[in-house]
């Protein structure tokens, strides 16, 4: 289908090109430092057609330390209830030490600062959220 292009690139350094009607990311941007997130949001804004949509399904940081701890406990309870073996949970926890999550509030502000409009969190369940904005 010539209406869809899939681009595999290093999001921290890639020229996103233009114009795109939609730019989507899932569970990736939380690996970037905050300044790189801000730069990426600006790059995405510049790569969208007028009215184009950016959607980011992401792992987020709790807005307070107490809520972050609650998110972590909930995630652990959920993966255990799903039957994920303990060794896989341990490996996931080790990988998560390298995550650089940011709060929903911070990311929405950075998206607005980058020039995106209609910025919103359209879904959130504990530490997982869908953030979006339009050019």
What are these regions (language model features)?
Residues 12-23:
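A short acidic, Gly/Pro-enriched loop at the edge of an enzyme's catalytic core
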Residues 23-24, 111:
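Hydrophobic beta-strand segment of the Class I
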Residues 24-25, 55:
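A conserved beta-strand element that flanks and buttresses the S-adenosyl-L-methionine
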Residues 38-50:
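A short glycine-rich, Lys/Arg-flanked "PGG" loop and its adjoining helix->strand segment in the class I
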Residues 48-59:
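Conserved beta-strand signature within the Rossmann-like core of class I S-adenosyl-L-methionine
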Residues 57-114:
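C-terminal alpha-helical "lid/dimerization" subdomain adjacent to the S-adenosyl-L-methionine
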């Amino acid at each position: 289908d010539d209406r869809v292009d899939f681009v595999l690139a290093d999001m921290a350094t890639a020229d996103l090109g233009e114009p795109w009607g939609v730019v989507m990311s899932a569970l990736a941007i939380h690996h970037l430092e905050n300044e790189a997130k801000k730069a990426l949001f600006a790059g995405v804004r510049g790569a969208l057609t007028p009215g184009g949509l950016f959607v980011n399904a992401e792992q987020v940081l709790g807005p307070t330390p107490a809520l972050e701890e609650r998110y972590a406990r909930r995630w652990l309870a959920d993966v255990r209830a799903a039957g994920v073996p303990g060794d896989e949970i341990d490996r996931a926890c080790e990988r998560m030490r390298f995550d650089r999550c940011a709060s929903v509030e911070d990311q929405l502000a950075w998206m607005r600062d980058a020039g995106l409009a209609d910025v919103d969190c359209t879904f959130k369940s504990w530490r997982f959220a869908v953030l979006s904005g339009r050019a």
